[in-house]
Amino acid sequence: MRESEASIRGRVMRDLIAHVTNDHLIGKKIKNGELRKKIGDSEPPWKCPDCFSLDVIEMDNFSMEYLQAKENPNTEKVILQLHGGGYVGAMRNAYRMFAGLYCEVSHGMSVLTPDYRVAPEHPYPAALEDAYAAYCYLLEQGWFSEQIIIAGDSAGGGLAMALCHYLKDHGKQLPCGIVAMSPWTDLAASGESYETNFERDPLFGKTRDSLIYNKDYIGDNDPYNAYISPLYGDFRGFPPMLIQVGSYEMLLSDSVDVAAKAREQGVKVRISIYEGM
């Protein structure tokens, strides 16, 4: 899809989200994550499409779901999907659907999605520990690091980069690529777009009570810690990154600043900014 085409659809979606998130309706509960938690608790069991198989893997502190194509699976690469949710929302059916989409657009790559622990019950470093355990699981299953692609949106996109900082600092091999959609990379909320898009962001804007100001995950830790806010880490040696973000998002700076810093440090980065989204 061309960015111009996406922008037209994006404007329609933006206006719809802005209406739904009106504080007089249910906006506050959407923005602060309360509705997400309630929906997550009440979601019906997900029915896996017949073209896929889905296995649940129990780890010590969390579970994971491994989705595979039944016909012609791609055995060259595997995707580790890290879900979003502001580090306070557990995995939802939407991410099971995302796993299927990832499998389809990648011509059959399998997708591992950890339902990592979230705050406030499990603040930092729980999510990072579980993401690392999921990565190690793939290695233990015979995958090589150069076969692993890490994908994530929002908190999941930031967690993908935080995981790579952790892997590099601990002498581990990094994945072959990162796909990040609207990654949350600056939990210190210091970027320009936190102010310039405050009135325009239909999902998180116009309130300081939204998920992106929630401190449950950070706790008493330093928000400038690269394992919490990957923007502040050293990107040298990182794999190629694909970053996608909307121009109206408060998280725009999180993407733009990461892309600029990573490029300066020799990383191959492609960033797509979709106007009006």
Name what the model sees in each region:
Residues 9, 19-22, 46-48, 53-277:
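Alpha/beta-hydrolase superfamily serine-hydrolase fold, recognizing
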Residues 1-45:
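N-terminal targeting or regulatory segments adjacent to alpha/beta-hydrolase or S9 domains
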